[in-house]
């Protein structure tokens, strides 16, 4: 699995290297965390129809790769799964907007399934976790530096320690990307992985969310506070954003995109 992660890192490097030249006028190159790749593709036609700007979605970059590409002038905008690090701010990067989406646990089981939130960390710590009906629960991990680990730790007190212990085991799968994570979850009977509502909806995944304490992580539940846990997605621009990047940020924050974003399990909010 370490070899798989190294190959993904090399692929990201080759993609960034292939993006020759500065961002062209009349188009916006954008990329970022894998969970939003299909979200951006779904938004592109309406954005282009309204602005005349072509939205060119560069896949498979990840948050760090996309942020670096913005700093290098190869992307006009990034959508990052985490806030900026100090070294990225030192390169002139800035957060110019936010998207929010519910985050929860998904499974390949036909469902509906429900877990007590207080029991989840114990399942992650168990050597042989089981679903309530006795079916083996197959947990998939993310790389240690992935932003989803922080979201899980915030969702379940004690999860950070549980994930640290799980990484010592050699029998668990590690998903290098958001797409790998969903692919593995679909293939495994009894899977349990963390994911955003936006990714599951945009990619039309054959996965179902698990209710926590009886509450499903829907967008309505997230917005009314009955389901409190989500993931922030950061719109990252250079110190002087181009007109195309500004147009896309304005598009996301305005009424034209509101309905489509909701269909995809997202809401926009200015920082």
What do these predicted ranges mean?
Residues 26-64, 68-75, 80-99, 103-271:
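Exported/periplasmic ABC-transporter solute-binding proteins
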Residues 19-25:
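Sec/Tat signal peptide C-region and signal peptidase I cleavage site
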Residues 6-18:
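Bacterial N-terminal signal peptides
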Residues 1-4:
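Positively charged n-region of N-terminal signal peptides that target proteins for export
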């Amino acid at each position: 699995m370490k070899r798989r992660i190294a190959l993904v890192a090399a692929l990201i490097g080759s993609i960034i290297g292939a993006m020759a030249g500065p961002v062209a006028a009349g188009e916006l190159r954008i990329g970022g965390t894998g969970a939003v790749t299909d979200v951006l593709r779904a938004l592109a036609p309406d954005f282009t129809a309204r602005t005349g700007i072509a939205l060119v979605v560069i896949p498979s970059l990840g948050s760090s790769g996309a942020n670096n590409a913005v700093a290098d002038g190869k992307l006009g905008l990034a959508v990052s799964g985490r806030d900026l690090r100090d070294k990225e701010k030192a390169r002139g990067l800035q957060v110019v907007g936010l998207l929010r989406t519910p985050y929860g646990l998904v499974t390949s089981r036909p469902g509906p399934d429900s877990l007590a939130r207080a029991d989840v960390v114990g399942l992650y710590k168990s050597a042989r976790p089981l679903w309530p009906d006795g079916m083996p629960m197959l947990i998939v991990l993310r790389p240690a530096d992935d932003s989803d680990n922080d979201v899980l730790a915030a969702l379940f007190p004690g999860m950070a320690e549980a994930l640290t212990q799980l990484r010592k085991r050699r029998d668990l799968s590690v998903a290098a990307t958001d797409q790998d994570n969903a692919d593995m979850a679909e293939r495994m009977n009894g899977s349990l992985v963390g994911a955003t509502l936006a990714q599951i909806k945009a990619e039309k995944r054959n996965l179902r969310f698990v209710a926590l304490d009886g509450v499903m992580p829907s967008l309505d539940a997230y917005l009314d506070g009955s389901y409190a846990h989500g993931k922030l997605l950061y719109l990252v621009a250079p110190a002087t954003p181009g007109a195309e990047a500004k147009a896309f940020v304005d598009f996301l924050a305005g009424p034209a995109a509101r309905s489509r974003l909701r269909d995809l399990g997202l809401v926009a909010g200015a920082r």
